[in-house]
Amino acid sequence: FEKADEVVAAYDAGRCDTYTTDKSGLAAQRIKLSKPNDHIVLPETISKEPLGPVVRQGDAVWEDIVRWSLNVMIEAEEYGITSANADSMKSSDNPAVKRLVGAEGELGAAFGLDNDWSLRIIKQVGNYGESYKRNIADTGILPDRGPNQLWTKGGILYVPPAR
């Protein structure tokens, strides 16, 4: 098969007994089946393939902005910053929180952005947990975050220091 949709169609028609890919792919393809509830995504992990944002080669500035936009969402979750409370975090006693929401330092300047760029991400998209819940868990695709949890909750998500 050349395309994922061809594999899914063959599986749905009974021409394949099983179908394997990463869990997020399986979950997303499952909803396309004629009877999605008749099929399950097994909990076992056969291999680990981390997925993340990608950009075209040769644009290091855009790559940094995309990567750090995701990092902002992850770090916001770690610090308990949500789309609902982001503005109030400007007056936090925690200097790292103040840096993250642009109340101190010049994190945005490193990327050619203003200091409110990270605050706007959090307010408009939410932290990583909010975004995961809204776009993945609540849709039934992958209700359990598994490794998509913060490292403090047994997952693999953490943000390298930014100074």
Label each PLM-derived region with a short phrase.
Residues D5, D12-A13, D17-I40:
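A ligand-binding cleft/hinge motif common to bilobed small-molecule-binding domains
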